Amino acid sequence: MSDKRPVVIYGANGFSGRLIAEFLREYNLPFIAAGRNRARLEDVMKHVPGIESANYEVVETKGSVEELTQVFAGAKVICNTAGPFIYNGPGVIEAALNAGCHYLDIGGEQAWLREVAGKWGCKFAQRGLLAAPATAFMSAVSDAAIRMCLEGHRGIDTLEVLTMFKGNPTFGSTQTIFAVIQTDAYYLEQNT
């Protein structure tokens, strides 16, 4: 859509999308706030502190791969916050690849992570692009803690991680919970 706005936040009308918009505004990074409902997008953006100084554009899209590809054209990075990712992610990641953009999301859904690794990772790498799911604090912090625990400790054969939260889940998070319980769960045993 615009080479002047290198970041597209897809799902910017949600809680995480607003936080990302706030971060981008703070660092003077131009962005497109995209989603399925212009009125909700505009309302959420009004609540971003200092938004009046941001270089951003609100774009409504119905979410088809073709339409998303047009919205993403000219951007460098697509930040997908529209879960459940197992349902909403495939079209967004395909459009990001079509538009030649790096892709990241805030998901933590195991089925979606497996799909990105199995279907999309190599396609992005072949084009010199990055597909990075699960970049939000829930997944990223746990991953960093696990790596720190295992550094230099080859004898550990089991590590269980529990992430606990305070507060109430958002509507989007609730939808993700119900999506996840309908998918198969996997675990590594002896790293296989």
Where are these regions (language model features)?
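Rossmann-fold NAD(P)-binding glycine/threonine-rich loop
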Residues: G107-L130
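Active-site-lining helix/loop region of Rossmann-like oxidoreductase modules
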Residues: Y10, F15, E151-T192
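Short helix-capping segments at alpha-helix termini
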Residues: V48-A54, F124-R127, R154
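NAD(P)H-binding glycine-rich loop region in Rossmannoid oxidoreductase-like domains
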Residues: P30, R40-E115
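Residues in the short beta-alpha loop(s) of Rossmann-like NAD(P)-binding domains
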Residues: N13, R36-R38
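Short beta-strand "acidic-cap" motif of Rossmann-like dinucleotide-binding folds
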Residues: A33
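Adenosine-phosphate binding glycine-rich loop
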Residues: R127-K166
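N-terminal Rossmann NAD(P)H-binding glycine-rich loop of SDR-like oxidoreductase domains
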Residues: R5-Y27
